[in-house]
C-alpha cells in the first residue's frame, strides 16, 4: 500500500518534534561536538593541505574481488560480510541480507565533475546485487547516501531503513514512503521473515547535503540482532561515552564495524580515526573489528593507507582481532584467519613503479578537501 507524500511528511515532522535531540530546527549530539575546524587550526591545516607530501591516493590499482559467486551460497556460519568500499557493505545475518550506505557514484559530491573521486570501481555493479531484505542508511552525507544508487534501487521492493528525517531525500528520489522506516535512537524495526531486529543507536556526527540544511536530518549507528549473531555498524562518529550504553543494552557482538579513515586532529569530534576506533571497540566490549570508511575516497590529508597501517600495528597490543578483507571479498568472521594486508601489495607496486600516486582521469587536488565534509 502506498502512502501519501503529504501524510509521510507530516508524520515525519511530528516525530522529529518529539525527538529529544531535535530543537525544532536542527538535530544535536548528546555531547558537545564540533564538526568544523578547531579554533586556531585553520591556517596550519590549510598549510598542511597545500604543502603536505602524504600519499593521499594509492600509487597502483586497488585489487577487487567479485562477490557474486559467493552470494549464491548461504553463509555456512550464518554471518557473512562483503565490504564494497568506504561504508558500503552487504551483511548476511541469520537469514537476512542488508545493504548499508549504498554509494556507487564516481564522486562523493553534489556535482559529477568535481569533489572526492573513487580510488577504485565498485566491486560489483549495483544492478547485480542479490535480493535484499533492507537498505540501511546511516545519514545523508554524499559518501553515505548516493542519489543515483537510490534511484537504481527504486524498482526493488526492498525496505529502506534510515535515521529520522533522511526519508525526505528518499521520497524525493522516488522511493514509496510505505517502504521507508525512519528511526530515532533506540528505536527498532524487525525484518521479516528472518526476525532480524535493527536498532538505531547513538553516534556523534552531523548531517547535511548543502550549506542550508546542516543537521536538518539525524545520524545514527545501528545494532543488528539475528537469531544467533549480533553486529554493530558504527557508521560515522567521533568517540562518545554512549558506546558504553550500547554495550550495556546489547551485550556481546560477533562483528563490529568502525570507521578509521578521513580523520584529522583539527576536525573536532566527529570522526574516530584508528586509535579512537580501538578505544570505541574497548567500550563496546567485544567482537571482531572490521575497519571501514577508508580506501575508497580521499577525504583527508593522511596517506591513503595510514589508517589501516596504524590500526594493524596497534590492534595486537589491545587484544583486538581484525578482519581486513579485500574489497568485494565475502568473508565469515567466525572463520577469520591471519591479517590479510592487501594494501601492502598496492604500496609495493607503487614503490616498484616509482609512482607517487595513481589517479585516473583526475588531478591530485581534485580528490581532497581540507575540512570535514562527511
Where are these regions (language model features)?
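Divalent metal-coordination and catalytic microenvironments
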Residues: 91, 101, 139, 146, ...
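Catalytic core of the metallo-beta-lactamase
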Residues: 88-94, 190-253, 268-276
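Metallo-beta-lactamase
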Residues: 1-128, 163-235, 254-260, 310-328, ...
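Di-metal (Zn2+ and/or Mg2+/Mn2+) metal-binding site signature of metallo-dependent hydrolases
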Residues: 123-154, 164
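Short hydrophobic/aromatic-enriched beta-strand-loop microsegments
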Residues: 100-101, 159-161, 177-185, 254-259
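Active-site-proximal loop/helix segment associated with metal-binding centers of metalloenzymes
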Residues: 48, 52, 104, 200-226, ...
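Cap/insert and terminal regions of metallo-dependent hydrolase folds
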Residues: 2-30, 118, 125-126, 134, ...
Amino acid at each position: 500500500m502506498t502512502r501519501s507524500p503529504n501524510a509521510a511528511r507530516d508524520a515525519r515532522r511530528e516525530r522529529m518534534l518529539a525527538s529529544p535531540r531535535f530543537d525544532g530546527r536542527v538535530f544535536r549530539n548528546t555531547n558537545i561536538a564540533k564538526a568544523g575546524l578547531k579554533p586556531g587550526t585553520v591556517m596550519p591545516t590549510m598549510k598542511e593541505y597545500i604543502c603536505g607530501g602524504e600519499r593521499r591516493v594509492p600509487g597502483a590499482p586497488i585489487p577487487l574481488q567479485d562477490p557474486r559467486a559467493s552470494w549464491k551460497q548461504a553463509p555456512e556460519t550464518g554471518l557473512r560480510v562483503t565490504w564494497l568500499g568506504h561504508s558500503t557493505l552487504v551483511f548476511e545475518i541469520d537469514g537476512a541480507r542488508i545493504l548499508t550506505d549504498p554509494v556507487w557514484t564516481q564522486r562523493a559530491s553534489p556535482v559529477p565533475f568535481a569533489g572526492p573521486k573513487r580510488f577504485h570501481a565498485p566491486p560489483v555493479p549495483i544492478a547485480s546485487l542479490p535480493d535484499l531484505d533492507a537498505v540501511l542508511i546511516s545519514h545523508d552525507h554524499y559518501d553515505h547516501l548516493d542519489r543515483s544508487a537510490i534511484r537504481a534501487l527504486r524498482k526493488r521492493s526492498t525496505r529502506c531503513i534510515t535515521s529520522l528525517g533522511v526519508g525526505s531525500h528518499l521520497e524525493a528520489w522516488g522511493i514509496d514512503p510505505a517502504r521507508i522506516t525512519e528511526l530515532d535512537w533506540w528505536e527498532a524495526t524487525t525484518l521479516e521473515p528472518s526476525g532480524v531486529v535493527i536498532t538505531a543507536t547513538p553516534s556523534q556526527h552531523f548531517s547535511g547535503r548543502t550549506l542550508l540544511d546542516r543537521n536538518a536530518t539525524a545520524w545514527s549507528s545501528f545494532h543488528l540482532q539475528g537469531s544467533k549473531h549480533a553486529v554493530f555498524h558504527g557508521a560515522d562518529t567521533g568517540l562518545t561515552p554512549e558506546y558504553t550504553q550500547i554495550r550495556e543494552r546489547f551485550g556481546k557482538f560477533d562483528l563490529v564495524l568502525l570507521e578509521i579513515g578521513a580523520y584529522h586532529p583539527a576536525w573536532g569530534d566527529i570522526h574516530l580515526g584508528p586509535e579512537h576506533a580501538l578505544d570505541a571497540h574497548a567500550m563496546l566490549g567485544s567482537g571482531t573489528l572490521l575497519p571501514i570508511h577508508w580506501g575508497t575516497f580521499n577525504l583527508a590529508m593522511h596517506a591513503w593507507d595510514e589508517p589501516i597501517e596504524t590500526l594493524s600495528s596497534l590492534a595486537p597490543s589491545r587484544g583486538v582481532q581484525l578482519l581486513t578483507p579485500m574489497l568485494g571479498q565475502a568473508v565469515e568472521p567466525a572463520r577469520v584467519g591471519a591479517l590479510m594486508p592487501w594494501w601492502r601489495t598496492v604500496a609495493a607496486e607503487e614503490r616498484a613503479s616509482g609512482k607517487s600516486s595513481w589517479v585516473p582521469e583526475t588531478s591530485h587536488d581534485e580528490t581532497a578537501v581540507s575540512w570535514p565534509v562527511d
